[in-house]
Amino acid sequence: MTEEPSRSATLEALKEAKRHGALISYDPNYRARLWENEKTAVASMQSVIPVVDVMKVSEEELLLLTEEPDYEKAALKILKQGPRIVAVTLGEKGAMIATQQHCETVKATPVEKIIDTTGAGDCFWGGFLSKYLKYGKGIEVLSWEEIMQCAVMGNSVAGLCVQKRGGIPSVPNKEELSDIWSA
């Protein structure tokens, strides 16, 4: 999304996938150094939101995309553009999950020692989405309780992630996940 022609090609591919019934998940993963400037980054990231079904943002990305310091109001601004669920990762405080009807913060999974937070947001989102997929139904029919369980799973996976060093090495393996996957 940082440069043309990949930016417009990606957006068209997302629109086509959406037309064919694909669930569109989006994590802007903003990295200032990759963009020409902040204005271009914001416009590009915002252009994707109307196509999205579920979206994960960090606190910084939420403020950047909405210019709204109140997280609940900011999430509602994004929800009005199309996504059914917005998850805001809050670091050691957990994650705020918002839909048009509900907004709640799910506390982070307690850990003995935080070693490195690199990749924690990605691990959260992977855990969230994997729990969603286990339900085997459309995002539009998930109950609030099921959405909350997705967030709990995401926090559990992120909790494992932060106890190791490095982005890729910290991603939990199948054995490490076996206890929480059965939940």
Language model features with spans:
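Conserved beta-alpha-beta core of the PfkB/ribokinase-like small-molecule kinase fold
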Residues: 1-77, 83-84, 93-94
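Conserved phosphate-binding/catalytic region of the ribokinase-like
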Residues: 15-16, 67-183
